[in-house]
Amino acid sequence: MLNPQLNKNGELQHLLTIEGLPKSNIIHILDTASSFVSIGDREVKKVPLMRGKSVFNLFFENSTRTRTTFEIASKRLSADVINLNISASSSSKGESLLDTIDNLAAMHADMFVVRHAESGAPYLIAKHLGDTGQSHVHVVNAGDGRHAHPTQGLLDMYTIRHYKKDFTNLTVAIVGDILHSRVARSDIHALTTLGVPEVRAIGPRTLLPSGLEQMGVRVFTDIDKGLKDVDVIIMLRLQNERMSGALLPSAQEFFKSYGLTTERLALAKPDAIVMHPGPMNRGVEIESAVADGKQAVILPQVTFGIAVRMAVMSILAGN
């Protein structure tokens, strides 16, 4: 089966999901990102790799880190960035998603960065562009529903590689609302592709999706058992905006049962790192002493995210 993200030469055409993305492509993105990290320390934080290219940011859901870092990444590559104000666009007047895409493509767009509440929306856009003879326009998925958040997954892998050097001897725990988390899905696919021998999912039964075991994940409903001797902890927030029904008694009860405290962190290896994709809810999934502690690498994740998104866009642009 053809991978819709790759061209006939196996090169990245779009970035829609980490699922099915070959290990070689992931490593290429991480290695390329390494060459971009130091740009942030320069007096002039720009390289001309996408000069003359137009990048349209289409965020149909709210975002702080992802939208901002994509904009910074585009500008550091010298691209022209257009941020579409969705609430003030014609989509709020009933224009279909694909009609919006056609009109923006007619403005000579080179790349669309898309966040959408509906799973599969970026794939639909990429397929439409191919079907209408516009396959030269690239699509980057910046998060679609519960489905995928590939650049977050990639920046998480970059962060892990930066601090742990190698993937093949790690135990990684993902903790919290995994049911509604596109980040968890992207991280799991990336971790297993890169050869992590043990990936653990920790959370209440109501927030654990079916099929985790089939993905090679060990499931724990007891956080104390799940955190024992892990190398990496990835905390996830409660996605209340995606929940329907009473999946939890309260945020306070969740913290009592699944919040990452200094006492629970001590169950992991002494050099374990703590990650979080944000936004972070202190006192719900993580206590401040851990979030601000020496084992937390949450802010470096954000910094690395710029370089990783630069790498993705640069590769898509043919560099």
UniProtKB/Swiss-Prot annotation:
GO cellular component, one term: cytosol
NCBIfam families hit by this protein: asp_carb_tr (TIGR00670), PRK00856.1 (NF002032)
Pfam families assigned to the protein according to its UniProt record, in alphabetical order: OTCace, OTCace_N
GO term, biological process aspect, one: 'de novo' UMP biosynthetic process
Enzyme Commission designation: 2.1.3.2
Name of the gene: pyrB
Assigned keywords, A-Z: Pyrimidine biosynthesis, Transferase
Protein name: Aspartate carbamoyltransferase catalytic subunit
Similarity comment: Belongs to the aspartate/ornithine carbamoyltransferase superfamily. ATCase family.
Pathway assigned to this chain's UniProt record: Pyrimidine metabolism; UMP biosynthesis via de novo pathway; (S)-dihydroorotate from bicarbonate: step 2/3
Chain positions recorded as L-aspartate binding sites: 93, 182, 237
Reactions catalysed according to its record: carbamoyl phosphate + L-aspartate = N-carbamoyl-L-aspartate + phosphate + H(+)
Superkingdom classification of source: Bacteria
Residue numbers binding carbamoyl phosphate: 65-66, 115, 149, 152, 278-279
Keyword Transmembrane helix assigned: no
GO molecular function: amino acid binding; aspartate carbamoyltransferase activity
